[in-house]
From Swiss-Prot:
It catalyses: L-aspartate(89)-[ribosomal protein uS12]-hydrogen + (sulfur carrier)-SH + AH2 + 2 S-adenosyl-L-methionine = 3-methylsulfanyl-L-aspartate(89)-[ribosomal protein uS12]-hydrogen + (sulfur carrier)-H + 5'-deoxyadenosine + L-methionine + A + S-adenosyl-L-homocysteine + 2 H(+). Belongs to the methylthiotransferase family. RimO subfamily. Its main location: cytoplasm. It is found in: Cytoplasm. It comes from Citrobacter koseri (strain ATCC BAA-895 / CDC 4225-83 / SGSC4696). Its EC number is 2.8.4.4. It comes from the Bacteria. Residues 376-441 form the TRAM domain. GO terms for molecular function: 4 iron, 4 sulfur cluster binding; aspartic acid methylthiotransferase activity; metal ion binding; protein methylthiotransferase activity. One of its GO terms (biological process) is tRNA modification. This is Ribosomal protein uS12 methylthiotransferase RimO. Residues 8-118 form the MTTase N-terminal domain.
Length: 441
């Protein structure tokens, strides 16, 4: 008879944004460290954890459906994540859920797991976790979360009510994690938070320490330190504070990627005021021009909302005019959707759905034309590409201008002598509005 003890198995579902993905990775790393197996199927698991998203109504619905599926297939379910902040809403639909915790409640999640599926016995000297921890991304890139929460109160958003005010991670801790990731083979770090440019504001940019050296807790100092690791560093979710200007020279010098993800949301000063967002559109255009003068290779990504309450045709036209002048490289656009608990719900003059749809189509048509023109400028040039996938037909990678999942790709047909994580030089042969095609130099 075998005396091998069966390891308890945990199923895991991770929904939502990269910030939620990082939370999932942390929970999974702790579970693996304690000796739990993480399995891909519900019926094979002793319990299922669902890390939910609650940002917009469609995300709430997806989360509730995932919880329901886990209950049907397994029966023992713990819920965490952003929707977990709305306990009553979950209990009303799924009363059989065992436990519910809010976002970044790692310790609570683990305590609940220990209660229902006791910790297994395992050899503490046998490492069950890779050096970089359990990652849900490919091995060659990783998200680095530098803070939690947000101090802004944008009227379309409920993140602060779910994740709280800004809490910056100690800079020494952040840099140590980055170093571990690089040592484990990561070639690209994507810096994320709810508000990356506010990093350190809550601690008055106090001085921390890394490897015995003093380092200021700020976005600029963080970028300076990350640049020493010799990998690609990409900034996401950058609020347009004045000090963002200070990172552009670092991009021009090649210290971090010339890529800025800066959600602007709209271009009408009146709508921006209703959103409780910065409203100096002329100033933003001047800054964009200045940034490009300092760093000609700069890629600008942004997101916008159309059909926000009170948006008139004149407001929308201001947005289109802004797009024409700014000529942003990568743009996402969302039709405004009411979110339970958001301040914008109480605003007058809600925009009809058919008007939102019509404006969204006009927005996308214009931006696709701009994006296609911007990418066409790259044809004939040589660029660096990091490889993401390789199969018998060729390789797929990304340029410095492309973040994983949300931007375009570079297709290298017939190029099979590479592996994920390789950075190679490519000549661009063709382009459309989103992607590039090229050949290895």
């Amino acid at each position: 008879m075998s005396n091998v003890t069966r390891q308890p198995k945990i199923g895991f579902v991770s929904l939502g944004c990269p910030k939620n993905l990082v939370d999932s990775e942390r929970i999974l790393t702790e579970l693996r460290t304690e000796g739990y197996d993480v399995v891909p199927s519900y019926d094979d698991a002793d319990m299922v954890i669902v890390n939910t998203c609650g940002f917009i109504d469609s995300a709430v619905q997806e989360s509730l459906e995932a919880i329901g599926e886990a209950l049907t297939e397994n029966g023992k379910v713990i819920v965490t994540g952003c929707l977990g902040a709305k306990v009553d809403q979950i209990r009303e639909v799924h009363p059989k859920v065992l436990e519910i915790t809010g976002p970044h409640s790692y310790e609570q999640v683990l305590e609940h797991v220990h209660h229902y599926v006791p910790k297994p016995k395992h050899n503490p000297f046998l490492s069950l976790v890779p050096e970089q921890g359990v990652k849900l991304t490919p091995r060659h890139y990783a998200y680095l979360k530098i803070s939690e929460g947000c101090n802004h109160r944008c009227t379309f958003c409920i993140i602060p009510s779910m994740r709280g005010d800004l809490v910056s991670r100690p800079i020494g801790e952040v840099l140590s994690e980055a170093k571990r990731l690089v040592d484990a083979g990561v070639k690209e770090i994507l810096v994320i938070s709810q508000d990356t440019s506010a990093y350190g504001v809550d601690v008055k940019h106090r001085t921390g320490f890394h490897n015995g050296e003093p380092v200021k807790t700020s976005m600029v100092d963080l970028c300076e330190q990350l640049s020493k690791l010799g990998i690609w560093t990409r900034l996401h979710y950058v609020y347009p504070y004045p000090h963002v200007d200070d990172v552009i020279p670092l991009m021009a010098e090649g210290k971090i990627l010339p890529y800025l993800d800066i959600p602007l949301q709209h271009a009408s000063p009146r709508i921006l005021k209703l959103m409780k967002r910065p409203g100096a559109v002329d100033r933003q255009l001047a800054r964009i021009k200045q940034w490009r003068e300092i760093c000609p290779e700069l890629t600008l990504r942004s997101t916008f909302i159309v059909g926000f309450p009170g948006e008139t045709e004149d407001d929308f036209q201001m947005l289109l005019d802004f797009l024409k002048e700014a000529r942003l490289d990568r743009v996402g656009c969302f039709k405004y959707s009411p979110v339970e608990g958001a301040g914008a719900n109480a605003l007058p003059d809600q925009v009809p759905e058919e008007v939102k749809e019509e404006r969204w189509n006009r927005f996308m048509q214009l931006q696709q034309q701009i994006s296609a023109e911007r990418l066409q400028e790259k044809v004939g040039r040589e660029i660096l590409v990091i490889i993401d996938e390789v199969d018998k037909e060729g390789a797929i990678g990304r340029s410095m201008a492309d973040a994983p999942e949300i931007d375009g790709a570079v297709y290298l047909n017939g190029e099979t002598n590479v592996k994920p994580g390789d950075v190679i030089r490519v000549k661009v042969d063709n382009a459309d509005e989103y992607d590039l095609w090229g050949s290895r130099v």
